[in-house]
Amino acid sequence: MEQAAGEPTRTCLTEDIPKAKRCTVIGGCGFLGQHMVEQLLARGYAVNVFDIRQGFDNPRVQFFLGDLCSQQDLYPALKGVSTVFHCASPPPFNNNKELFYRVNYIGTKNVIETCKEAGVQKLILTSSASVIFEGVDIKNGTEDLPYATKPIDYYTETKILQERAVLGAHDPEKNFLTTAIRPHGIFGPRDPQLVPILIEAAKKGKMKFMIGNGKNLVDFTFVENVVHGHILAAEHLSQDTALGGKAFHITNDEPIPFWTFLSRILTGLNYEAPKYHIPYWLAYYLALLVSLLVMVISPVIQLQPTFTPMRVALAGTFHYYSCEKAKKLMGYRPLVTMDDAVDKTVRSFHHLRKVM
């Protein structure tokens, strides 16, 4: 395939780095992607970024902008690299089914084919532990649990399709190796979702109640640990390892009560923690009633309820996952403890701190 017009010329520094240390981060301008770029550079990699728009500047990074579903746009960013990290996705709380399907599934199929066309050897996918979650308790869940037959949302539905496509493309005979990393509850500095949304809800007085008894354990995973898992997967993935065509949970390995975690963020930024309890069953059936009402009036009025049964399940059930497989096969250990991760995150959002 010929070089596309406008393709950046590689610098001498990049040319001095062996192909095994050249990589592309698809979605590299996003929350996880930026952290991944930073750690890869720190470890001596030459890094390309492919994204729909450029979100930051770094003279050591080559940026390629375009449509994930276009091989013509994507190919220049993958040419000459050994490894591709694919972490592009619409935000999980988006409710646009067509967008999720186009980016997470159609776009990923294009990533696979373009990787093969460009001679990429390794494709590391950012998947999600939610691909096995159906709204009921999961305690220390392992990777051999089946995919959810009733995914919690459009995001998860298309992440299942995406992960299946990537793992199914693993072909050691043709020197194309794939694996998928399944984080859960990613948080950290520059997070555009969890902390800002939480603080906005607190400002509106919506964080006074907790669903259930507050004891349900959940995995929240610090972004640096998620990146570490991706890089370990890439560095351990070879034709003679058991990583190929497999998925791996990556967590902080410190399950924490869901409401305790949120409370630590809130109080760290000078907001009150939830004080009152709503029984789980009551919250679930209220959400179910709201969903039914929305369905009934949908021919007349289109509404997007935020209080849904599955979101109640996310807040009120146990869902934490074993990362023993990643420990055994790639030597994974979290780099940052939960206490340090929460502290770093709170300090990074000082601009959201409530003035007392």
From Swiss-Prot:
It comes from the Eukaryota. Pathway: Steroid biosynthesis; zymosterol biosynthesis; zymosterol from lanosterol: step 4/6. The active site is at Y155 (proton acceptor). InterPro entries: 3Beta_OHSteriod_DH/Estase, Lipid_A_modif_metabolic_enz, NAD(P)-bd_dom_sf. It is a single-pass membrane protein. It is an enzyme of class 1 (oxidoreductase). It is found in: Endoplasmic reticulum membrane; Lipid droplet. The keyword Transmembrane helix applies. Its EC number is 1.1.1.170. GO terms for cellular component: endoplasmic reticulum; endoplasmic reticulum membrane; lipid droplet. A motif (Prevents secretion from ER) lies at residues 353-356. One of its GO terms (molecular function) is 3-beta-hydroxysteroid dehydrogenase (NAD+)/C4-decarboxylase activity. The modification N-acetylmethionine is found at M1. NAD(+) binds at K159. The chain crosses the membrane at residues 281-301. The keyword Metal-binding does not apply. Pfam families: 3Beta_HSD. Belongs to the 3-beta-HSD family. This is Sterol-4-alpha-carboxylate 3-dehydrogenase, decarboxylating. It comes from Bos taurus.
